[in-house]
């Protein structure tokens, strides 16, 4: 279990280091911060006068205890949210994935690469979609298993999404 936690933290801090930095500092002069907002975790890293934050949700298999999905998002200019979904191996990468915010169609995703932890699908939500995320219940992700070829569905809870996003925006002003 510690190995998966370490992989998750490595993934987070790799993502944090690649984000554009913001001129802000964390409360109390801390160099890192981690807070939980219902089903979302806010993770921030501060170096000198820059702070980068992401919000993350990890889902694990109840049977095996292994991570099956990680959603990692950050706010960008214009009220948009960008990020990545880390999904398990065994999916038909050529078919990508589709998202719905509750029952409303969202962006279609294309897998960009695979890492030892799983396969990455970049995601971007415009301001209108972000408003729907803040008031929604779930992001419904549908993709296809490679063999046998059948639909695979994931639900990403939006409990705490708005509070986590507001916190990231406040910390990176």
UniProtKB/Swiss-Prot annotation:
Keyword field contains Acetylation: no
InterPro entries xref list: IalB_sf, Invasion_prot_B
Signal peptide span: 1-23
A Pfam family: IalB
Keyword list, A-Z: Signal
Family statement: Belongs to the IalB family.
Name of the protein described by the UniProt record: Invasion protein B homolog BMEI1584
């Amino acid at each position: 279990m510690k190995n998966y936690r370490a992989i998750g933290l490595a993934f987070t801090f790799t993502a944090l280091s690649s984000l554009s930095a913001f001129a802000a500092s964390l409360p109390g002069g801390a160099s890192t911060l981690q807070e939980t907002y219902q089903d979302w975790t806010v993770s921030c890293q501060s170096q000198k006068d820059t702070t980068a934050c992401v919000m993350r949700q990890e889902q694990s298999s109840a049977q095996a205890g292994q991570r099956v999905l990680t959603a990692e998002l950050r706010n960008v200019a214009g009220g948009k949210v960008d990020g990545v979904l880390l999904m398990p191996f065994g999916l038909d990468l050529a078919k990508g994935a589709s998202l719905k915010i509750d029952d409303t169609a969202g962006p279609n995703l294309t897998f960009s690469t695979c890492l030892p932890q799983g396969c990455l699908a970049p995601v971007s939500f415009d301001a209108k979609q972000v408003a729907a995320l803040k008031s929604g219940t779930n992001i419904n992700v549908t993709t296809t298993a490679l063999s046998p070829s059948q639909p695979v569905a994931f639900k990403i809870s939006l409990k705490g999404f708005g509070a986590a996003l507001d916190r990231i925006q406040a910390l990176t002003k």
